[in-house]
Each structure stands twice: as structure tokens, then as C-alpha cells.
Amino acid sequence: MYTFQSKVRYSELDPERKLSIASIVDYFQDCSTFHSEQLGVGIDYLEERSLVWVMSYWQIVIDRYPKLCDNITIGTYPYEFRGFMGFRNFFMEDDKGERIIRANSIWSLMDLKAGRPARPTEEMVKAYVPEPKLPMDYEPRKISLEGEGRKMPSFTVGK
């Protein structure tokens, strides 16, 4: 697990003077980058191997938004690797240690030279220590279709 502390800045607020969704995502992405850098499998490691992690999915649950000057702790850890995908939880806590935001994310590792997904290297898998999934309601990723729908004419997709 990796954590860091910060203070909510004016530039991170939305019009209601709460931490904006974009800033929450920035904190979480920075946290995962700091984590990877600390483990020696960060940006330079990936670049040398023509690899990149691509965000595939976010689920963010906000119980309470931090406000201007609130002291916060941001944390992250992976909980699973499957094929070319990495599964990672994030959280944000207030200065009392209460978890006010939780998130689930799925990342895809891409090989930039081959132009396709790649499995994490053995070194990457060893560097990250998976922890138990964060307790939260995990939303399904598939969209359920309701009703019968209607038949449409076929068409060809080209370049």
C-alpha cells in the first residue's frame, strides 16, 4: 500500500468549493504513479520497455467531498493482476482517518511497439504486493439492456 498526505488547494475546487471530481482523479492517478516510482516500476521502467498503463475503468464512491484547506490522505494498492489487466483500489481519508472516498479501477498494460495489450513483467508482478479488495459495492461493468430492441439493417465498417 502506498499513501501520501496533502491539503486541498483552492485550484482544486469546483464551483461549490468542494474538491472537484477531476482533482479527485488527479490525486488518485498521482498516488498510483508515486507508488510505481517507489517500487522501481514507474515511468522510466515502462518507457524502457515501450509499455504504458491505460485506464480502462473507474468506479468512484464519494461519501463526503473534502473542502478547501482540509488535510487529506490518499492511498492505493493493487488487489489483482489478470492477463494484461491490473486491478487497483484507491481511497481518500480525512484528518480523522475516516474514509470519505473509495474507488475501484482497472488498468490495461499496452505494448506500444506491438500496438496490443501485454502481460505485466515478472518484475512488475513481484514489485506490487496485492492486498484484499477494498470493502465497497462493486458495480457491474456490463450494461444491461432492457426491452426487446429492434432489428436494424446491417452495414459494413471500413477504414
Where do the language-model regions lie?
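Hydrophobic beta-sheet segments that form the core/acyl-binding groove
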Residues: 59-95
